[in-house]
Amino acid sequence: MGKKCQLTGKKANNAFAVSHSHRRTHKLQEANLQWKRVWWPQEKRWVKLRLSTKAIKTLEKKGLAAFAREAGINLNQV
């Protein structure tokens, strides 16, 4: 599994590290991903997901079923 949020699809961003003399070197800005066990009340079980911290905040607001439906994810396959 890659470094990608399973609900939002967030992934790394290609960027430049710019020095004081303005030399630019490529760098990767990784998404802030965390492994999170989320309770799925409809199935009465835990689901382990790799989520960005922004997705964790949204998950607390919307709930797992609504967020997964919105993202088009089948939680039975996770």
Swiss-Prot record:
Superkingdom field: Bacteria
Family affiliation: Belongs to the bacterial ribosomal protein bL28 family.
Protease found in the keyword field: no
Cystine pairs: none
Any Pfam family: Ribosomal_L28
GO CC terms of this entry: ribonucleoprotein complex; ribosome
Tagged with keyword Methyltransferase: no
Species: Acaryochloris marina (strain MBIC 11017)
GO BP field: translation
Protein name: Large ribosomal subunit protein bL28
